[in-house]
Every structure is written in structure tokens, then in C-alpha cells.
């Protein structure tokens, strides 16, 4: 019921996308959605799959179609993944960060927060959303987690990008260090811009 997507590089597996849930709390316009039966991975399922992948995959991504922060066992999954030698990476829409302070004690190697999901749901006034995102992101970055605030909406719904960047600057003042894909705000904390993501055919 859930998906596993494996990425090869030079005949080696480098990345694996492990869908720990296909349930999401948003309805983003840019997301193709899934018609599969809703399912949330159990601890035994995660243990079995990661045992099979151990030693074969370096980067383990805990998402595909669902929102990983909805999973109550996410901290346990991260700890288990690290113990088995994976580098865990999570992408989230960021709406549940304020409710998941438990994740601050079980952070992944990298946390990618899709800020474009806010406007992608037709929402206005992102002040509270950005406040909650930045509060979690700054604390996570201070604890050694790489945090990437993503605005992957060039060519799509992006009229709020400038105001979102200004709100971020209110909480992490400029100047920022310019990068090829955005800015480095401070140690371990980045803003990344890109074109609107085009989903591959996942046979959903």
C-alpha cells in the first residue's frame, strides 16, 4: 500500500524514498495526489524494510506522497534509521512543526520544509505559519540539523515569495550569504529557490 522509490547512481543505490504514510493534511494544487488506500507504516514494517535496505542505501528519505510529521512513530523511525547506518532526510509541509517538539530530540540529518505549500493551498497571511516554521527551524539548526526552507514555485503560485522572505528576515535578519540556489541564513539554515516541482509518474 505504501511506496518505495530507489535512486541509483553509477550502479549503486544512493537514495531511497520510503513512504511511511500516504496520508496528508493538505491539498496542494501542485500535488498529483494518490488514489491508493490510506496506510501508515507500522514499526515492524519499517524495521523489516530498513533491515533489507541496510548497507545498500545511504540516504533514506521518509516521504513520497504523504506528510511524515503526521506519523506518531517518526522519532523512533529516525533513531532506528541512524542505528542501521542510514542518513535520514525528511521533507515536510511545515504545518505540524509546532505540535512535534518531540522531533527536536530525534532530528534527521536534513529537514526540508516546503514553504510553497502554504500558497499552494490557497492560504493567505502566512505570519503564524512562518513564525512556527522559523521557531522550529532555528532550534533544529542549532542542534546540528541541516534545515532547508524551500520555495520551489518559480513558474507557479509564487506571488507571496517576497513577503515570505521578508517574514523570514524578521526572524533571522539579513544580510544572508548568497548561494547558487538561494541563501545561507546562518549555520545549518538555508533558503532554497527552484522551479515548481514536476512529479514523475509514480503510478499512483
Residue ranges and their predicted role:
Residues 2-111, 121-128:
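Conserved alpha-helical substructure of the radical SAM core
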Residues 3, 7-8, 41, 61, ...:
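Radical SAM enzyme [4Fe-4S]-AdoMet core and its adjacent flexible, acidic
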Amino acid at each position: 500500500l505504501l511506496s518505495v522509490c530507489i535512486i541509483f547512481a553509477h550502479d549503486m543505490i544512493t537514495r531511497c524514498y520510503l513512504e511511511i504514510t500516504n496520508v496528508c493534511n493538505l491539498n496542494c494544487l501542485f500535488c498529483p495526489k494518490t488514489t491508493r488506500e490510506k496506510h501508515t507504516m507500522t514499526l515492524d514494517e519499517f524495521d523489516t524494510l530498513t533491515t533489507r535496505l541496510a548497507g545498500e542505501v545511504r540516504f533514506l528519505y521518509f516521504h513520497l506522497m504523504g506528510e511524515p510529521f503526521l506519523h506518531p512513530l517518526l522519532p523512533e523511525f529516525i533513531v532506528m534509521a541512524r542505528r542501521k547506518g542510514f542518513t535520514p532526510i525528511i521533507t515536510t509541509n511545515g504545518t505540524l512543526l509546532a505540535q512535534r517538539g518531540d522531533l527536536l530530540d530525534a532530528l534527521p540529518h536534513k529537514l526540508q520544509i516546503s514553504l510553497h505549500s502554504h500558497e499552494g493551498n490557497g492560504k493567505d497571511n502566512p505570519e503564524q505559519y512562518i513564525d512556527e516554521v522559523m521557531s522550529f527551524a532555528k532550534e533544529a539548526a542549532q542542534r546540528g540539523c541541516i534545515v532547508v526552507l524551500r520555495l520551489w514555485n518559480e513558474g507557479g503560485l509564487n506571488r507571496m515569495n517576497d513577503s515570505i522572505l521578508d517574514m523570514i528576515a524578521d526572524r533571522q535578519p539579513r544580510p544572508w550569504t548568497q548561494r547558487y540556489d538561494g541563501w545561507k541564513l546562518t549555520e545549518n539554515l538555508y533558503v532554497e529557490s527552484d522551479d515548481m516541482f514536476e512529479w514523475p509518474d509514480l503510478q499512483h
